[in-house]
């Protein structure tokens, strides 16, 4: 390849995406050749990955994260919705059996389930990332074995929340107004 007068840029890696078909080409045009999808509607992503693989749609390589959410009035409608620790563990097994490389635990999952869910994911060779479930702290999720806490506000909320404040709502963003007065 004669690159005289040009610039060679390696493919970029999007570390936290939620990819849809309309995003696939846009990512490539921006130089993103791999997207770490952090939770999606499983059948939609299955179709997109298949279409990219067949060359029907131009898009990046996609690394999938299995999304596990507890059922509540605030639940995300993405991934697997669970109502018990056993269902959460079954969801981990479902994702592992389909070649996902990690699971992402979300806001409404009962934080008491995290140690068992994380243990099963690690036993199966999966990483665990996620939001800090409501009514728990980043410290508790790290102690439960999280490999990664997504979004820096999820780490910092523990410094400014009062007991019982619900982070399943947009409050997880608006509570950040308290940061300027924080004295660590």
Indicate where each model-derived feature is located.
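Divalent-metal coordination cores built from histidine and acidic residues
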Residues: 3-9, 15, 19, 23-184
């Amino acid at each position: 390849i004669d690159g005289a007068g040009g610039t060679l840029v390696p493919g970029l890696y999007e570390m936290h995406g939620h990819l849809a078909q309309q995003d696939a080409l846009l990512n490539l045009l921006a130089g993103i050749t791999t997207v770490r999808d952090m939770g999606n509607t499983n059948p939609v992503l299955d179709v997109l990955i298949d279409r990219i693989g067949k060359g029907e749609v131009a898009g990046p390589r996609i690394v999938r994260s299995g999304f596990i959410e507890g059922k509540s009035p605030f639940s995300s409608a993405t991934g697997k919705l669970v109502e018990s620790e056993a269902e959460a563990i079954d969801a981990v097994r479902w994702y592992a059996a389909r070649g996902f490389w990690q699971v992402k635990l979300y806001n409404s999952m009962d934080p008491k389930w995290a140690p068992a869910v994380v243990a099963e994911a690690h036993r199966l060779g999966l990483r665990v990332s996620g939001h800090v479930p409501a009514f728990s702290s980043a410290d508790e999720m790290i102690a439960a074995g999280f490999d990664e806490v997504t979004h820096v506000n999820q780490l910092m909320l523990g410094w400014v929340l009062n007991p019982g404040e619900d982070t399943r709502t947009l409050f997880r963003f608006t509570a950040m107004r308290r940061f300027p007065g924080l004295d660590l």
